[in-house]
Swiss-Prot record:
Any coiled-coil regions, as ranges: none
CDD domains to which the protein is assigned, alphabetical: ABC_RecF
Keyword line: ATP-binding, Cytoplasm, DNA damage, DNA repair, DNA replication, DNA-binding, Nucleotide-binding, SOS response
GO biological process: DNA replication; DNA synthesis involved in DNA repair; double-strand break repair; SOS response
PANTHER family: DNA REPLICATION AND REPAIR PROTEIN RECF (PTHR32182:SF0)
Protein's name according to its UniProt entry: DNA replication and repair protein RecF
Main location: cytoplasm
Native source organism of the sequence: Listeria monocytogenes serovar 1/2a (strain ATCC BAA-679 / EGD-e)
Length: 370
């Protein structure tokens, strides 16, 4: 899979831009604040209809314009497929092969991407919410039904929290409704928990040998999905019965707090090197190696799940890695993955992959191909 071309209309600082790409490595070169990251963000938006920088859709629309539009053409399974995403003040519209998609969950997954940016180093050491968003993004593009389930979960969770808040304030409400919401909540919560746990298990299978190699055989990586829901055995009915029993036991605590106290929205992922928690005890180098191992593992995992390698986006991250990790990253993707790199300079990066790259010079919202 690779992105053949992209067209941007009124997106960020690009009023009208058309670019054609190499199926191997593409480098966006320029000073800071010229629009390099905006180009990678456009590719990410075209793939996931989401950004790694903001959740406010209005940020994408050029000042005093009504909408922003991204059009791309991807080579996938031997075919050339057009994608289109428009962002307005009222929301998003998506098309695949010129056909409008009723839901974004039907659109996501046509173009798979892996992004590695400086903020991804906080995937290991940052707050649990960062890791939950990571899981949602990665599982969602491989299994679009996951996004539908996630949306349903968030809807039920919001309703249940509102109801718990009313009970906390001792308002007169129908007590049966809480039981109905809890039943619905349990079904979707178990579904998400199982999908996340399965993903983490597969991710570890790919990430552990990569980490072992980068650490020169000195470190063993383990990844644990720390779920608030216990899935004992293989019977979904047993899982549900156990969860409903647990939720009944904490029902009064939830009413007192006015919030749902267990579920995927409170889960976390933990990383261990040689048995030690990397978040708490790992050095900065170990945390960076862990993040790099995870990103490289994503590439192979997406290939296993979809039959196609994803597009890799490296947003000013090479400067955050030492020469050894740079070399390992570029060597791992060489000749395998279409890659987009943003950087202010390539002078300190001595690798054949970048020497053979197609370079685009970015300055004040204009892009020129070398």
């Amino acid at each position: 899979m690779h992105l053949e071309s992209i067209v941007l209309r009124n997106f960020r600082n690009y009023e009208n831009l058309e670019l054609e790409f190499s199926p191997s490595v593409n480098v966006f070169l320029g000073e800071n604040a010229q629009g390099k990251t905006n180009l990678l963000e456009a590719v990410l938006m075209l793939a996931l209809a989401k950004s790694h920088r903001t959740t406010n859709d209005k940020d994408f629309i050029m000042w005093e314009k009504e909408e922003a539009k991204m059009e791309g053409r991807i080579a996938k399974h031997g075919q050339s497929v057009p994608l289109e995403l428009a962002i307005t003040q009222k929301g998003k519209r998506a098309k695949v092969n010129h056909l409008e998609q009723k839901k974004l969950s039907q659109y996501v997954g046509n173009l798979n991407v892996v992004i590695f940016a400086p903020e991804d180093l906080s995937l290991v050491k940052g707050a649990p919410g960062i890791r939950r968003r990571f899981l949602n993004m990665e599982i969602g593009q491989m299994q679009p039904i996951y996004l539908h389930n996630l949306s349903e979960y968030q809807r039920i969770l919001q309703q249940r929290n509102q109801y718990l808040k009313m009970l906390q304030m001792k308002r007169k409400v129908d007590p049966i409704l809480l039981d109905i919401l809890t039943e619905q909540f349990a079904d979707v919560a178990i579904n998400l928990t199982k999908r996340r746990a399965d993903f983490i298990q597969k991710l570890e299978a790919y990430a552990a040998p990569i980490h072992h190699q980068i650490s020169r055989g000195l470190e063993t990586l383990k990844i644990e999905y720390k779920a608030s829901i216990t899935l004992n055995g293989d019977d979904p009915e047993v899982w549900k019965a156990d969860l409903l029993q647990k939720m009944e036991s904490i029902k009064q605590r939830e009413i007192d707090r006015g919030v749902t106290l267990i579920g995927p929205h409170r889960d976390d992922s933990l990383f261990y090197i040689n048995g030690q928690n990397v978040q708490d005890f790992g050095s900065q180098g170990q945390q960076r190696t862990t993040a790099l191992s995870i990103k490289l593992a994503e590439i192979d995992l997406i290939h296993e799940e979809t039959g196609e390698y994803p597009v890799l986006l490296l947003d000013d991250v090479l400067s955050e890695l030492d020469d050894y990790r740079q070399s390992h990253l570029l060597g791992a993707i060489e000749g395998k993955v279409q890659t987009f790199v943003t950087t202010t300079s390539t002078s300190g990066i001595d690798h054949e992959t970048l020497k053979q790259a197609t370079t685009f010079y970015v300055e004040k919202g204009t892009v020129k191909k070398s």
